[in-house]
């Protein structure tokens, strides 16, 4: 029996290979970064107190690429049409380019506008290779006419906004240990489920590999982190999530595939939009670092570092479950009920713990240490 004849088996192998490879490579990357001084030094606005290597994205990219290459060499891509096979490699190339832009920023501190220009250029390049929004299917308005084909100019604009927007939303989310990797991993698992329910096998393979490298990296990045993914890692995660969401339908963007990433990533997207609007209202650059982000607000409200991250995790998994309902996936209502129960329980327990800690603080304010993570760290 050929296990790789099953799409689920291929996705499972892809996930495991990416997770194991990333987990094994992270310590090597960390040692390399410490040896050459490629670290993020602590200062008065940052929460870490020792130099932290910011090159964890290297291990993630290598884990992702290794998993896809291994599955391909074992014949796993034989389940795909040649056009879908090409889309996987185009997505991998785009992910690598976005990673290199972020890596250059990690090493040389690029200014925002050159980074943005590079992102737009790469997005245009992958659009030319077929990773594009070519049509929009809105069944409520186009039931008889079918999908609305987009002119090339509009298709290019929509694709660039989609890819660059989601990439930077994930990048700006990378403000606490484990936050970006965890949210991206949850989103990737949601994409695996929906992709297979819609028979979008290529997208499922990509999402499974992405979920694997997120899981492997979290082993070293969850609080207290031993390494940061850096802008290279967050750009890689954001671009890959955005690209996977349009690789499934390839030439067109259906209502379901549009709502899925918007639902799963609505929290970081809304946070990014609110932060940009707030900065612009004050006459500041949209790239000006501050403490407006949701995770900074939760920290200031008194939640600990870990509790803040877990709250955002459970809300993201609830949004992913809601996306499964929209996609009409199997057992969708069971997953939504379970996700809702987890969300409600986490919120209730977190509020009670916070109230208890505040009561202790009011009773004996000198006996309760201040959580240094409550200071936050603006990274975007």
Where are these regions (language model features)?
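Membrane-interface capping segments at transmembrane-helix boundaries
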Residues: 28-32, 348-363
């Amino acid at each position: 029996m050929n296990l790789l004849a099953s799409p689920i088996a291929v996705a499972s192998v892809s996930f495991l290979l990416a997770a194991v490879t990333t987990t094994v490579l992270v310590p090597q990357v960390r040692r390399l970064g410490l040896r050459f001084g490629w670290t993020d030094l602590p200062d008065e606005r940052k929460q870490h107190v020792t130099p932290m290597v910011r090159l964890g994205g290297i291990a993630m990219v290598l884990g992702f690429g290794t998993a896809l290459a291994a599955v391909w060499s074992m014949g796993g891509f034989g389940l795909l049409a040649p056009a879908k096979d090409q889309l996987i490699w185009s997505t991998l190339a785009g992910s690598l380019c976005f990673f290199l832009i972020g890596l250059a920023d990690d090493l040389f501190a690029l200014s925002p506008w050159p980074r943005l220009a590079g992102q737009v250029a790469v997005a245009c390049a992958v659009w030319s290779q077929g990773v594009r929004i070519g049509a929009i299917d809105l069944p409520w308005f186009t039931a008889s006419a079918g999908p609305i084909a987009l002119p090339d100019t509009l298709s290019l604009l929509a694709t660039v906004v989609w890819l660059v927007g989601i990439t930077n939303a994930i990048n700006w989310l990378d403000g606490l240990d484990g936050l970006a990797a965890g949210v991206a991993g949850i989103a990737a698992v949601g994409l695996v489920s929906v992709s297979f329910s819609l028979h979008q096998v290529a997208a499922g393979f990509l999402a499974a590999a992405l979920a694997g490298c997120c899981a492997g990296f979290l082993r070293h990045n969850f609080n207290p982190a031993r390494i940061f993914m850096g802008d290279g890692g967050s750009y890689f995660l954001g671009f890959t999530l955005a690209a996977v969401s349009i690789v499934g339908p390839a030439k067109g963007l259906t209502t379901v595939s549009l709502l899925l990433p918007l639902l799963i990533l609505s929290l970081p997207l809304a946070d990014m939009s609110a932060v940009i609007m707030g900065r612009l209202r004050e006459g500041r650059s949209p790239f000006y670092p501050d403490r407006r982000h949701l995770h900074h607000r939760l920290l200031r409200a008194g939640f600990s570092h870990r509790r803040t991250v877990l709250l955002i995790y459970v809300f993201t998994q609830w949004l992913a479950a809601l996306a499964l309902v929209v996609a009409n996936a199997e057992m969708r209502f069971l997953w939504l009920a379970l996700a809702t129960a987890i969300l409600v329980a986490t919120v209730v327990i977190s509020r009670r713990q916070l109230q208890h800690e505040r009561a202790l603080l009011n009773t004996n304010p000198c006996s309760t240490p201040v959580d240094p993570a409550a200071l936050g760290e603006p990274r975007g």
